[in-house]
Amino acid sequence: MAGCGEIDHSLNMLPTNKKASETCSNTAPSLTVPECAICLQTCVHPVSLPCKHVFCYLCVKGASWLGKRCALCRQEIPEDFLDKPTLLSPEELKAASRGNGEYVWYYEGRNGWWQYDERTSRELEDAFSKGKKNTEMLIAGFLYVADLENMVQYRRNEHGRRRKIKRDIIDIPKKGVAGLRLDCDSNTVNLARESSADGADSGSAHTGASVQLPVPSSTRPLTSVDGQLTSPVTPSPDAGASLEDSFAHLQLSGDSIAERSHRGEGEEDHESPSSGRVPDTSTEETESDASSDIEDAPVVVAQHSLTQQRLLVSSANQTVAERSDRPVAGGGTMSVNVRSRRPDGQCTVTEV
């Protein structure tokens, strides 16, 4: 019995040891870095898309410029994914920012410097240590040339856009690593991205200050009353004058128009061109449209309208006088108050 128990005990221990070894073998592959299906290398700063496929962050960024879809399942990539990516290991980003050596490589961005990812930084350091003048880098599906003499980088097929690079110590202030910001609490969102896949700033940041464009104020030409220039934009001290004063000004200006109409052409006594115009009274309610006609019509037309209206007033007064001479049924005379309208818009009351 004891022997059987010992045998049974040894037999029970074998599967346990075997299971432990299997567990160790299963946990080892989980620590390996996944491979990227775009660059066909181990992922650098791996990110997980909503479809659960894993790629390098810069590879996803480069693919998003072309189709904004997953490279494997073609599911659409959200618009804000590049601004708020889902990192598999955020601690790796912080470790990469601290670096392994004394010097690392940076490229220029807006208002700061970005650190290259670890793989690209090793390639640049290797070329620099060997004394090469330039080297090529594959970043997000685009070939870049790093000019180590002039310390600039540019796309191999686009030499116009150049970006400064530098080799510096690890502890200098920087914005992030390979387009991934170190300050995760930043609320800055890139609204319009350019076609840049090297992890640089590719959009204009949204600022809280709003720029207001100056609105041009509508200006009106200067007008004159009795030869004095007045500005309709600036209120005059006599803005509160009564309608009678305004009508008096209109009458004076109307008479001056009539006087000038009798002069020949070129006989203006060096008067200013604007002295013959009447102030714009569109804001005041007049009882007739004759004043507005005088304001805009030429001198000849104004003279003709003045003469015609004077004839109408005189004929109306004559008709009223004839009617007043007729006897009334009561034996008295008829007293009529006639309200006439002068050409300048002023109303007068004539008692007959």
UniProtKB/Swiss-Prot annotation:
Zinc finger RING-type: from-to: 36-74
Gene3D superfamilies documented for this protein: 3.30.720.50, Zinc/RING finger domain, C3HC4 (zinc finger) (3.30.40.10)
Major subcellular location class: cytoplasm
GO BP terms, alphabetized: cellular response to glucose stimulus; cellular response to hydrogen peroxide; cellular response to hypoxia; negative regulation of cellular response to oxidative stress; positive regulation of canonical Wnt signaling pathway; protein autoubiquitination; protein K48-linked ubiquitination; ubiquitin-dependent protein catabolic process
Statement: the UniProt record of this protein carries the keyword Zinc-finger: yes
Keyword Zinc-finger: yes
Location of cross-link Glycyl lysine isopeptide (Lys-Gly) (interchain with G-Cter in ubiquitin): 84, 94, 130, 175
GO CC, any one term: cytosol
Residue positions binding a glycoprotein: 107, 110, 114, 144, 153, 163, 175
Ranges of biased composition (kind: Low complexity): 197-210
Pathway it works in: Protein modification; protein ubiquitination
PROSITE patterns from the UniProt entry: WWE, ZF_RING_1, ZF_RING_2
Modified residues (Phosphoserine): 288, 292
Region: Disordered, residue numbers: 195-242, 259-293, 317-352
Domains: entry comment: The WWE domain mediates non-covalent poly(ADP-ribose)-binding.
Protein name, entry field: E3 ubiquitin-protein ligase RNF146
Source organism of the structure: Rattus norvegicus
